[in-house]
Amino acid sequence: MYQTLAISASQGPAPYDGSPGGFMHSAPSSPVYVPTTRVGSVLPTLPYLQGGGAAQPGHAPAGHVWSQPAAESPSYGAAGGAHPSGRFPYSASPPVANGASREQYGGGLAAREQYGALPRPLNGSYPAPYASYVGPQLGPAWPAAPFENSVLHCLQGRAAPIPVRAPSAELLEDLSESRECVNCGSIQTPLWRRDGTGNYLCNACGLYTKMNGLSRPLIKPQKRVPSSRRLGLSCANCHTTTTTLWRRNAEGEPVCNACGLYMKLHGVPRPLAMKKEGIQTRKRKPKNINKSKACSGNSTTAVPMTPTSTSSTNSDDCSKNASPSTQPAASGASSSVMSGPGESTSPESSNLKYSGQDGLYTGVSLTSTAEVTASVRQDHWCALALA
């Protein structure tokens, strides 16, 4: 296989001369011009372009290697000039060994050179070959200044600058000097107003003048002095100067609250012996009284025991502190009272029994008042019973 390449290289010219053969293969897809005379001299020296039979017989075992190029050789041979190319529409030059092809190719270049200047020249006119196609549709020449349109002419014609609105005299006056209210002398206000004569007024004075028709008073009205702090006032009856409320008698004289109420209720002047140095005030009870608050028991007062529940569990709670020896003795009594400090504290006299509840409460025996109080406080229902 490699001997065939060696033979072709030895029979042909220098490797540089054989290189156009590579260009010949790419001639259908390459725009490079290759002289046909040189290609004609190289083609006979390449055995694989002459067919499979042109190979030497001594290399028959290797002939099948060149069978595929030999079969495709006609497409690259003399008839390969008609092979189309996807890159350029024109076909390659036929391998003709004469000077006519060069002259024909040169004529083609000359024809392309006359259309080479496709961009429009500066003067705006087209060359002669395009006159018959472009002339009827477009004008003979483009405008000399393509960027001069109506907008540019309008901008160039407006030479005078745009007038800027000058600040008003009032704005300059506000910036140069501060205003002052002619009524109160204030220099700071959220809104400046004017009076009937054109003088500046602050917002407060302007609103007051607009609503009332008068100038706003500069001195604020003093608050009413409390009656207890009024200087120079004294009761016409008891001559006191301290009171919670000043009243007037029938003659119109100021009197203290105590003398005025006494005169109003009794119709006579209040006696001087009833005068007090301090002011007696009534202790008012709070409006919200906790009615469910239990009152603490006292040893000198009897605490009535009124059960609020008739369940059997409450009867068991009340009798848990009773002694078993005194329960039969208390069963025959119809009512019971709590013994005082001067009475006997014997177990018989301290027996406690609920009236009307003979079937439920058989008897409760407590030794002392302290035990009664302790027993009452331990039960959850006794707090409501004592309320």
Swiss-Prot record:
Q: Where in the cell is it found?
A: Nucleus
SMART domains in UniProt: ZnF_GATA
Molecular function terms, GO-annotated = DNA-binding transcription factor activity, RNA polymerase II-specific; RNA polymerase II cis-regulatory region sequence-specific DNA binding; zinc ion binding
Bias type Basic residues, positions: 281-290
Q: Where is the composition biased (Low complexity)?
A: 299-316, 329-350
Q: Which InterPro entries match?
A: GATA_N, TF_GATA_4/5/6, Transcription_factor_GATA, Znf_GATA, Znf_NHR/GATA
Q: Which Pfam families match?
A: GATA, GATA-N
Q: What is the disulfide pattern of this chain? A: none
Q: Which residues form a coiled coil?
A: none
- What exactly does this protein do? Transcriptional activator.
Record protein name field: Transcription factor GATA-6
* Organism name: Gallus gallus (Chicken)
Source taxonomy = Eukaryota, Metazoa, Chordata, Craniata, Vertebrata
